[in-house]
Amino acid sequence: MSHHKKRVYPQAQFQYGAGVPPAGIPVSDASIIPPQVQSPQVGATDNMIPPYNQTPTMNQMEQAPQAQMFTPAQQQLNQQINSVTTNMGAMNIGTPMMEQMPQQMTPQPQMYGQSQGLMGHSNKPMNQLYPVDLLTELPPPIHDLMLPPPPLMVSPDKMLVPSETANASSDYLRCTLNAMPKNGSLLKKSKLPLALVIRPYQHLHDEVNPPPLNEDGLVVRCRRCRSYMNPFVTFIEQGRRWRCNFCRLANDVPMQLDQSFEGAPANRYERNEIKHSVMEYLAPKEYTVRQPPPSTYIFVLDVSQNAVKNGLLATTARSILDTLEFLPNHDNRTRVSILAVDNSLHYFSIPLDEESDQIRMMDISDIDEPFLPKPHSMIVPLNECRNNLEKLLTQLPEIFQFNIMSKFALGPALKAAQNMISNLGGKIVVVSATLPNIGIGKLQRRNESGVANTPKESTQLLSCQDAFYKNFTITCSKSQVSVDLFLASEDYMDVASLSNLGRFTGGQTHFYPGFTAANIADVTKFTKEFSKFLSMDLSTETVMRARGSTGIRMSAFYGHFFNRSSDLCAFSTMPRDQSYVFEMSIDENIGTEYCYVQIAVLLSLNTSQRRIRIITVAIPTTESLSEVYASADQLAIADFFTKKAVEKAMNSSLQDARDLLNKSLQDILATYKKEIVVSNTAGGAPLRFCANLRMLPLLVHALSKHTAFRAGIVPSDHRAAALNNLESMPLKYLVKSAYARVYSLHDMVDEAGYPDENGEIVLPEPINASASLFERYGLYLIDNSSELFLWVGGDAVPELVNDVFGLQDIFQIPNGKHELAIVEGSEFNERVRNIIQKVREHDDVITYQTLYIVRGPSVSEPVGHAAGRELQPLRMWATSNLVEDKVLGTESYREFLQTLKNKLNK
């Protein structure tokens, strides 16, 4: 028990949650646990894997392609698997019943993804199907949203060196189906999508948990399909050859595979490509067209009246100044340039520190044909010009403080910046508070009043207004230049047009609506995100290719990159905070027990190194539709549907996007009912689904209420920014963006808000995103991955108000963008601040979530009170995250499920 004493607030303890099951535990499931047998899947059975520390002898290797032999470790594991299977028979554990299973046999949600080690139709361990009734699982068990996907059931004997790292972690690569249909007709019949969710990098900085690196220059690849050697190949002919697991071709084993870097004998089974599915090569010369160029940053800064007036220019200059020492500069070659823009282009000639401290500004007013006055002094080495750069950044706000120009020539500035670094490549960083309104790429304010929330919204408000913003990205891709935008203004910015710059170059668009430097919360968010963005490691001259084994083909690609060919995605620079989705198709029957997918990323680092990152995954195959469903990954499927809906919203209409989401889900449920459910009863029939997919309807329902897709009038900049974010957002943040995580703070457990034994702040268990669980006297934190809302019940007792805010009257609580002030002597205030800080901690994205304090309505608040009217928009925004409810005129989740059931029973 914790030694911390829990403060009990009057009324707040004895009523809360009365009659409501804990989040994630349906009432009907509370005492039911499915059969538990340990799985032979690697990663779930650490104790079954013996140490592997010796090279197999030649007679232990495969003598011929048909006669595969195992290493000693594999033989031992095979024996253990057989023993487990035998024991299961003795324990009378059979395959879980299908839809005849009574409701009381529903497994606990935390067990859905746990394989029971039972043999599937192909006599190999497979995930088993556990049915649930969605309508009896209300509120939905949201704990499932934090569970890993159903495990990849790959027997250890299929790996050269069985280990936890032999198959790719779901952090790097997730497949929507962890049991691959053996033919296209079975995939089509299932109505489930087949796609990969790829996140090549897990952290903003590469030194955090890097994968193993091969530095000897040996890269072993298949002669035919060009896949890389991986833990799932087999050695044949006394180890002299290896059989490719992708195309089955026998390849010669190079002598260097059994030699160290110095040429001494070495154990091939200790090599990284054989032990680890995620690893890197230091690329040899044949993978390098030229010496990796220095990292180059060109800052295109809006210095027009808007940017000066709202403080964006001064905030940006200060942020760059403070972040110069954190710019990636591992090889001491990083270069920087600054281009100020209004109705003219203002270049700065920056001398080396040792030569002079006189910085010259050169104004080019001919924006139609801009030229570089002193090209060699425009882009300067950071190390050698550090003092002069700091001097310029300090003076920049003063130089333009009285600027009254309202024009912003972004198009000409982009062309000039691209011309400056066309030989090097690099990153153009645009910071703007003004709609481009002069020169090439000039944009107009669009009339939203008669178009928003109509079928024309996508074509007239969310489409690219000027072809320049798409065509320019082709030029950028050829010269290895990416574009990132930071748009911060109270005015219309046409995010829909400008976001194309980042979409096709590997960049990103960051949107700060209503920004003003007068609000410290706005400044804090911008500076923290801008600084993390600048300090983030990146890769230049990057290409990524996905390969599938025989029968599998990549068919569509989603994310921020330039698709050069049918399977090659090009990134002028690859950031560390984005993910990608590749759709796959099955072109021919798969005749093997397992299929394979490999992601290869060829890149240049800021260390002047050229590297190849390899991610390989093995997926069991099946001819059973029930096994396909039992191994489906609901979060990866939701991500894929999101990408398809974003595409539909931008190319067709928002209604079509919502229809796509709902129709996709309905087709899956209808197929499950028709093909998997054994017996049906009309009218009172339950809404059956498999446990591992039970959150998919909730996520689809939540996505239809997301700012990106929901019906109603949404400012086009906000909607375009939301669509842009969903395109590239890593999966775990996308899930929170769709279904917000809600914490009840007034009654949290004693340990919450304090550090645990590892120094990590303990968070309360999330509750369902529904106002029905909110008490009028409660305190709640809503986290939607972009913002935080601290909701104070309108009837909160004075003790709670005093402990949290240090105020005596609830009506004194500041509403809107505010940090939670420190209250001296209040332990509860410290705990709440600790929780907010913990929720904001991210080392894999640059997002810093602004906190909005919201006072809920009170029974004592006079009807029509001015304060209540002012708070209404903020309250509506906060409660729009409670997606299980009727928000903004939409169905509640219960009604949504009932509608689905009625459609399926027609």
Swiss-Prot record:
Its main location: cytoplasm. Keywords: Cytoplasm, Cytoplasmic vesicle, Endoplasmic reticulum, ER-Golgi transport, Golgi apparatus, Membrane, Metal-binding, Protein transport, Transport, Zinc. Signal peptide: none annotated. Residues 222-247 are annotated as: Zinc finger-like. It holds the Pfam family Sec23_helical. GO terms for biological process: COPII-coated vesicle cargo loading; intracellular protein transport; macroautophagy; positive regulation of ER to Golgi vesicle-mediated transport; positive regulation of protein exit from endoplasmic reticulum. It is found in: Cytoplasm; Cytoplasmic vesicle, COPII-coated vesicle membrane; Endoplasmic reticulum membrane; Golgi apparatus membrane. GO terms for cellular component: COPII vesicle coat; endoplasmic reticulum exit site; endoplasmic reticulum membrane; Golgi membrane. It is a peripheral membrane protein. The keyword Methyltransferase does not apply. InterPro entries: ADF-H/Gelsolin-like_dom_sf, Gelsolin-like_dom, Gelsolin-like_dom_sf, Sec23/24_helical_dom, Sec23/24_helical_dom_sf, Sec23/24_trunk_dom, Sec23_24_beta_S, SEC23_SEC24_subfamily. One of its GO terms (molecular function) is SNARE binding. Zn(2+) binds at residues 222, 225, 244, 247. The keyword Endoplasmic reticulum applies. PANTHER family: SEC24-RELATED PROTEIN (PTHR13803), SECRETORY 24AB, ISOFORM A (PTHR13803:SF39). The COPII coat is composed of at least 5 proteins: the SEC23/24 complex, the SEC13/31 complex, and the protein SAR1. Golgi apparatus membrane; Peripheral membrane protein; Cytoplasmic side. Belongs to the SEC23/SEC24 family. SEC24 subfamily. Component of the coat protein complex II (COPII) which promotes the formation of transport vesicles from the endoplasmic reticulum (ER). The coat has two main functions, the physical deformation of the endoplasmic reticulum membrane into vesicles and the selection of cargo molecules. This is Protein transport protein SEC24-2. It comes from Candida glabrata (strain ATCC 2001 / BCRC 20586 / JCM 3761 / NBRC 0622 / NRRL Y-65 / CBS 138) (Yeast). The gene is SEC242.
